UniProtKB/Swiss-Prot annotation:
Its main location: membrane. The gene is Trhde. Binds 1 zinc ion per subunit. GO terms for molecular function: aminopeptidase activity; metalloaminopeptidase activity; peptide binding; pyroglutamyl-peptidase activity; zinc ion binding. Residues 1-14, 143-154 have a biased composition (Basic and acidic residues). Residues 15-25 have a biased composition (Basic residues). The modification Phosphothreonine is found at T71. Specific inactivation of TRH after its release. Glycans are attached at N131, N202, N217, N264, N380, N647, N676, N691, N705, N726, N842, N948. It catalyses: Release of the N-terminal pyroglutamyl group from pGlu-|-His-Xaa tripeptides and pGlu-|-His-Xaa-Gly tetrapeptides. Homodimer; disulfide-linked. It is found in: Membrane. This is Thyrotropin-releasing hormone-degrading ectoenzyme.
C-alpha cells in the first residue's frame, strides 16, 4: 500500500482550497509552524541539500522550519505579532527539549512493546509481496504457516513507539532520498557485522546488523534497503565515541523497499558512524531472499535454509545498502541448532557450542564485495573435497545419499581444473581461501555465483554416471564453467549498475564455451556449438521489434529484473565473441587480464572495458576505437542484415548494404522507435570467394554505411561469395538469388569445401531470412537437401533447430503431412547409416565419441519426431522390454527420445508406468526426463491431469512446473489445454514466479510462442489487457511473436506447400 495513499478528485480539490488559505494566512503572519506530527521532527533544512542546489520547494520548506516573511504593508511590525512570535519560539524550544529527552529515553529502552493482542509474541509477519515492521521475538509463539495480525505497510516507527504518522502527501517531494530508485550516495557502508539466529523448527530468524558507515555529505536521514523484515530497534552512534546520535524515528517505505531513519541532528560529512539494527523475519517458503527448501531421506522430510540475493533480494534478509556499487567487508555469525551446519562466503573461523544444543559459527571477514553475492546456508548436508594447485579448498555439499553415490564427484573434479584454468587465463589468482558448491533441491535458477559459496539446483550439478547422458553431462559442465567464471567476472569485478549486467553475464556465458573447450578440446564448443546454442537462439529474440539494447537504462526498481534476460546473457556473449575475433584472441586475452587487474575488488562500467581493450590493441600496433564500434552494438537494439549483391556491369565489384533485421515488417512500422530509424552499425564483415574446388583467403571489410561498393578479387561468373565466415559476427547475410543458387549447388556437389560452421550458418540464415520475407520459402528447404551427405553434428543441429518452429507453425494444418514427408525424406538416409547406439556408458570415451553420438541422437530425434516407422517401432520395443523385465536397457543418450515416443504411441498403462518411475527414482537427471516424457501423451485427459498436478509442490518442484506447462504447450494435442490452463491459473503462477528472474518470461514465451491463429491472437491480446502492466514486456514480445506467426501463415504458407507439392512429385 502506498505510503501517501491514493489521490482522488475530492482530495485534489481539498488541497487546492487548503493552499489558498495558507497563502492568505502567510500574508497576515510572519511565520507558521507545520501541523504535521512527522514534520515536527525535521528541524532545520538539510545543509547538504541546499548546498547542492536541490533546496526544498516552498510548500515543503514552510512545513519544516521557521521562515519569517514581510508583507507589502508598513515596515513596522505590530507589537502583538512580535509577542506572538516570541511565544511561539519559546514553545518550540520547550517541545524540542522534551522530544530530545524522550528520544534518549527511547534509545535506552528500545521498541520492546508488543502489538496489542500478541502477548509479547510476533506482531504479525509481512504478507507476501508486502513490507511491514513488527515487534517481538522470532523465537517465541510462532508456528510455521500461522497468519498473524499485520501492521499497515509503510508505518513510521520511532525508537520508543511502535508507530507514528507517515509523511503527508504534500511532503512527498522529489528530493526526498527515500523516494528515489537509487540511494543518494550521502552514506557509504564500509563494514557489516551481521549476527543471525535461525529457528528452523518454525522457519523464522532474528538478526542484528551493525554497519560502519562513512558520511560523504551531511544528512539527517539514514536510508538503506529493507523489505519484508520487522525492524525492532535502530541506534546510531558516532565512531569516535562521541555517544549516540538521537533517532527521531524510522519507517519502512515499501515503494522503494527502503528503511528510513530520521535523526534529530545532522550527520557530519567526512565522519564515520555506526548503525545498529535489530530485526526479525521469516525463512520464506518462496525462492528469493532467505528461503527454505526440503528433501526426503529414509522417509523423513528434512529442511534447509538457503539464500538467493541477486539482484535485489539481500534486503529481504537484512537491512543493507543493496546496490552493486556499495562494496563493503562482511563479518557473519550464524547461530543454529547443533544438528545443522552453516555455510557462508568465507570459512568458519571459530564455532562456539552451547549447552542447550545450539552452536554459533563465526566466519572470517570477506574482502570488499557487493551485497547481491553474499550468501549463507543452514543444512544437514555432507561433503567431499579437493584442493587446487594454489591451495584453494573446494568442497561439494549435497544430500547425504547423493554424496554416498558419488553424484557430486564429477562437479568437484572439473571445478578444481577450472579454477586452475581461469587463474592461468586471467593471470589473477582466485581471491578466497575456499570455494563451496552447494546442491539444493529447490532454487529459482540453475545456479548462483555467490563468492566462495556457489549454489546450484541439483539438476545442474549432480551427475550419476549410470543414468546420465552425454547431453546431461554437457549441461552440468557448462553451468559449472559459467559459475566459476563469475568468481572473476561479477564477484571480483562487479558492474557499477544493473544496466551493464551483461558485463558479467555475457562474459560468463561466453566462457561456458571457452572453459568447456579447455576440459574437452575436441568438442570445439566455441567455434561450433556456440552458433546453435547462443547465436542462432538469441538472434530469434533480438529480431523482434520489441527487443531492447544489451545495455538498457534502469529507471525504475521494476526495471532491474527486466535486464536479466537472454539479450544480456546470449547477445552479450555473442558480442564478446565478435570482439575477440576481430581483435585477435591473444590481444583480447591480454586486455581482459588488464581489466581484471585494474578493477579487482571494485566496480567497472562498459567504458572501462572498452578503454582497456583499446589500450591492448594500441600496444599491438592497431588503432581501433573500441568504444565507438561497440557502443553501436550495445546501445542500439537488434542487429543488421548485410546484403551482398554481385554487380554484373562492373567486373569484381559488389554492392554491400545494411539494414535493421526485423522478423515482422508490420511490427516495425507500428513501433514508434523504429519508424524512419537510421540504425547503423560498424560491421566487421569477413568475406571469401570460392568455386567448386577452391576458396580464397579470408578478407575483412568494415561496413559502416547503408550501402557501399567494394572491389573483390577472384570474382567471376561461376564464383560464389560467402560473408561472415564461421559466423563470428552478430549479423545475418543475404545474397542475390544467383549467389544462393551457387551456394546450394556447392553444398550438393561438395559441401566440405565450406567449413562446418559456415554450413550451419548458411542453414540458419536461410530459414530466418525466409521467415522474415527476405527470401523465397523454398531456398532453406532446398539447402537442407544436401544433409543426406552431411556427417557432422553442427549442420544437423542447426537444421533441427530451424525446422522446429516451422514444424510448430504447420503441425495443425490439414496438409501438414506433405511437410512431414519432405523432412523424413531428408533424414532417412542418415538415420539408416547411423542406426541406434548400444546401451553402454564409459566416461573415458565421452570426449572421443561426443560429436558422433550427438549426431546420432539428433537424427534419431528428427526421425522419431516426424514419424519414421522404424524409429517408432524401436522406441516402443525398448519401452515394452523395460516394463516387462523391469530392467532399463534403453541407451542413455536417447532415453528422453524413447520415453517421449513411447508415451505418445502406447496406452495409458505406459503413462502410469513412467509416472511411477518418476516418483521412485532418486537420480535427478532421470527424474527430469521422466517428467518431461509425461507431457508427450496424445491423451488430453492425461495432459490435463498432469497440468493440474504440476502446481502441487509436493509432487513437482516449483522450478519444474514451468517446464511441464511449456512442454504440454509444445505438444499439438495439448497446446490449447496449456494455453487455457495458463490463463486460468495466471494469478497463482504470477504470485509464485513473478519476482524470479526469467521464470515469468520463460513461462509466457513457452506457452504462447506457437499460437498462430487469429482467434488465439485475439485471446492473447484480451488476456494481456485484463492484466495491464503485469509482465508487460514479456506479453508484448508474446503478442509480436504471435502476430508474426499469423502474418507468416497468411503470406507464405501457400507458397511453401505449393513448392513442397512439386518437390515431392519429382
Amino acid at each position: 500500500m502506498a505510503l501517501d495513499g491514493e489521490r482522488g478528485e475530492q482530495e485534489e480539490e481539498k488541497k487546492k482550497k487548503k493552499k489558498k488559505k495558507k497563502r492568505k494566512k502567510k500574508e497576515e503572519e510572519g511565520a507558521e509552524k507545520s501541523s504535521s506530527p512527522f514534520a515536527a521532527t525535521m528541524g532545520e533544512d538539510d545543509a547538504a541539500l541546499r548546498a547542492s542546489g536541490r533546496g526544498l520547494s516552498d510548500p515543503w520548506a514552510d512545513s519544516v522550519g521557521v521562515r519569517p516573511r514581510t508583507t507589502e504593508r508598513h515596515i513596522a511590525v505590530h507589537k502583538r505579532l512580535v509577542l506572538a512570535f516570541a511565544v511561539s519560539i519559546v514553545a518550540l524550544l520547550a517541545v524540542t527539549m522534551l522530544a530530545v529527552l524522550l528520544s534518549l529515553r527511547f534509545d535506552e529502552c528500545g521498541a520492546s512493546a508488543a502489538m496489542p493482542g500478541t502477548d509479547g509474541g510476533l506482531g504479525g509477519f509481512p504478507e507476501r509481496g508486502g513490507n511491514s515492521s513488527y515487534p517481538g521475538s522470532a523465537r517465541r509463539n510462532h508456528h510455521a504457516g500461522e497468519e498473524s495480525s499485520q501492521r499497515e505497510i509503510g508505518e513510521v516507527g520511532t525508537a520508543g513507539t511502535p508507530s507514528a504518522h507517515p509523511p503527508s502527501e504534500e511532503e512527498q517531494e522529489q528530493w526526498q532520498p527515500w523516494t528515489q530508485l537509487r540511494l543518494s550516495g550521502h552514506l557509504k557502508p564500509l563494514h557489516y557485522n551481521l549476527m543471525l539466529t535461525a529457528f528452523m523448527e518454525n522457519f523464522t530468524f532474528s538478526g542484528e546488523v551493525n554497519v560502519e558507515i562513512a558520511c560523504q555529505n551531511a544528512t539527517r536521514y539514514v536510508v538503506l534497503h529493507a523489505s519484508r523484515v520487522a525492524v525492532e530497534k535502530v541506534q546510531v552512534a558516532e565512531d569516535r565515541a562521541f555517544g549516540a546520535v538521537p533517532v527521531a524515528g524510522f519507517f519502512l517505505y515499501p515503494q522503494t523497499q527502503v528503511l528510513v531513519v530520521v535523526l534529530n541532528r545532522t550527520l557530519d560529512a567526512q565522519r564515520h558512524y555506526n548503525l545498529k539494527i535489530i530485526y526479525n523475519a521469516l525463512i520464506e517458503n518462496e525462492l528469493l531472499g532467505f528461503f527454505r527448501s526440503s528433501y526426503v531421506i529414509h522417509g523423513e522430510r528434512r529442511f534447509l535454509g538457503v539464500t538467493q540475493f541477486s539482484p535485489t533480494h539481500a534486503r529481504k534478509a537484512f537491512p543493507c545498502f543493496d546496490e552493486p556499487i556499495y562494496k563493503a567487508t562482511f563479518k557473519i555469525s550464524i547461530k543454529h541448532q547443533a544438528t545443522y551446519l552453516s555455510l557462508s562466503n568465507m570459512p568458519v573461523e571459530t564455532s562456539v557450542f552451547e549447552e542447550d544444543g545450539w552452536v554459533t559459527d563465526h566466519f572470517s571477514q570477506t574482502p570488499l564485495m557487493s551485497t547481491y553475492y553474499l550468501a549463507w546456508a543452514i543444512c544437514n548436508f555432507t561433503y567431499r573435497e579437493t584442493t587446487t594447485k594454489s591451495g584453494v579448498v573446494v568442497r561439494l555439499y549435497a544430500r547425504p545419499d547423493a554424496i554416498r553415490r558419488g553424484s557430486g564427484d564429477y562437479a568437484l573434479h572439473i571445478t578444481k581444473r577450472l579454477i586452475e584454468f581461469y587463474e592461468d587465463y586471467f593471470k589473477v589468482p582466485y581471491s578466497l581461501p575456499k570455494l563451496d558448491l552447494l546442491a539444493v533441491p529447490k532454487h529459482p535458477y540453475a545456479a548462483m555465483e555467490n563468492w566462495g559459496l556457489s549454489i546450484f539446483v541439483e539438476q545442474r550439478i549432480l551427475l550419476d554416471p549410470s543414468v546420465s547422458s552425454i547431453s546431461y553431462l554437457l549441461d552440468v559442465t557448462m553451468v559449472i564453467v559459467h559459475e566459476i567464471c563469475h568468481q572473476w567476472f561479477g564477484d571480483l569485478v562487479t558492474p557499477v549498475w544493473w544496466e551493464d549486467v551483461w558485463l558479467k553475464e555475457g562474459f560468463a556465458h561466453y566462457f561456458e564455451f571457452v572453459g568447456t573447450d579447455y576440459l574437452y578440446p575436441s568438442w570445439n564448443m566455441e567455434k561450433q556449438r556456440f552458433l546453435t546454442d547462443v547465436l542462432h537462439e538469441v538472434m530469434l529474440l533480438d529480431g523482434l521489434a520489441s527487443s531492447h539494447p544489451v545495455s538498457q537504462e534502469v529507471l525504475r526498481a521494476t526495471d532491474i529484473d527486466k535486464v536479466f534476460d537472454w539479450i544480456a546473457y546470449k547477445k552479450g556473449a555473442a558480442l564478446i565473441r565478435m570482439l575477440a575475433n576481430f581483435m585477435g584472441h591473444s590481444v583480447f586475452q591480454r586486455g581482459l587480464q588488464d581489466y581484471l587487474t585494474i578493477h579487482k575488488y571494485g566496480n567497472a562500467a562498459r567504458n572501462d572495458l572498452w578503454n582497456t581493450l583499446s589500450e591492448a590493441l594500441k600496444r599491438n600496433g592497431k588503432y581501433v576505437n573500441i568504444q565507438e564500434v561497440m557502443d553501436q552494438w550495445t546501445l542500439q537494439m537488434g542487429y543488421p542484415v548485410i546484403t551482398i549483391l554481385g554487380n554484373m556491369t562492373a567486373e569484381n565489384r559488389i554492392l554491400i548494404t545494411q539494414q535493421h533485421f526485423i522478423y515482422d515488417i508490420g511490427a516495425k512500422t507500428k513501433a514508434l522507435q523504429l519508424q524512419n530509424s537510421s540504425y547503423l552499425w560498424q560491421i566487421p564483415l569477413t568475406i571469401v570467394v570460392g568455386n567448386r574446388s577452391h576458396v580464397s583467403s579470408e578478407a575483412i571489410i568494415w561496413v559502416s554505411n547503408k550501402s557501399e561498393h567494394h572491389r573483390i578479387t577472384y570474382l567471376d561468373k561461376g564464383s560464389w561469395i560467402l560473408g561472415n565466415i564461421n559466423q563470428t559476427g552478430y549479423f545475418r547475410v543475404n545474397y542475390d538469388l544467383r549467389n544462393w543458387r551457387l551456394l546450394i549447388d556447392q553444398l550438393i556437389r561438395n559441401h566440405e569445401v565450406l567449413s562446418v560452421s559456415n554450413r550451419a550458418g548458411l542453414i540458419d540464415d536461410a530459414f530466418s531470412l525466409a521467415r522474415a520475407g527476405y527470401l523465397p520459402q523454398n531456398i532453406p528447404l532446398e539447402i537442407i537437401r544436401y544433409l543426406s551427405e552431411e556427417k557432422d553434428f553442427l549442420p544437423w543441429h542447426a537444421a533441427s533447430r530451424a525446422l522446429y518452429p516451422l514444424d510448430k507453425l504447420l503441425d495443425r494444418m490439414e496438409n501438414y503431412n506433405i511437410f512431414n514427408e519432405y523432412i523424413l525424406k531428408q533424414v532417412a538416409t542418415t538415420y539408416s547409416k547411423l542406426g541406434w547406439p548400444k546401451n553402454n556408458f564409459n566416461g573415458s570415451v565421452v570426449q572421443a565419441s561426443y560429436q558422433h553420438e550427438e549426431l546420432r541422437r539428433e537424427v534419431i530425434m528428427l526421425a522419431c519426431s516426424f514419424g519414421n516407422k522404424h524409429c517408432h517401432q524401436q522406441a516402443s520395443t525398448l519401452i515394452s522390454d523395460w516394463i516387462s523385465s523391469n530392467r532399463n536397457r534403453i541407451p542413455l543418450n536417447v532415453r528422453d527420445i524413447v520415453y517421449c515416443t513411447g508415451v505418445s504411441l502406447l496406452d495409458e498403462d505406459v503413462w502410469e508406468f513412467i509416472w511411477m518411475k518418476f516418483h521412485s527414482t532418486t537420480a535427478v537427471s532421470e527424474k527430469k526426463i521422466l517428467l518431461e516424457a509425461l507431457t508427450c501423451s496424445d491423451d488430453r485427459n492425461l495432459l490435463s491431469r498432469l497440468l493440474n498436478l504440476s502446481l502441487n509442490s509436493e509432487v513437482v518442484l516449483d522450478q519444474d512446473a514451468i517446464d511441464v506447462i511449456i512442454h504440454v504447450a509444445r505438444n499439438p494435442h495439448g497446446r490449447d489445454l496449456a494455453w487455457k490452463f495458463f490463463r486460468d491459473k495466471w494469478k497463482i503462477l504470477n504470485t509464485r514466479y513473478g519476482e524470479a528472474l526469467f521464470m515469468n518470461s520463460k513461462l509466457i514465451s513457452g506457452v504462447t510462442e506457437f499460437l498462430n491463429t487469429e482467434g488465439e491472437l485475439k485471446e492473447l491480446k484480451n488476456f494481456m489487457k485484463s492484466y495491464d502492466g503485469v509482465a508487460s514486456a514479456s506479453f508484448s514480445r508474446a503478442v509480436e511473436t504471435v502476430e508474426a506467426n499469423v502474418r507468416w501463415k497468411r503470406l507464405y504458407q501457400d507458397e511453401l506447400f505449393q513448392w513442397l507439392g512439386k518437390a515431392m512429385r519429382h
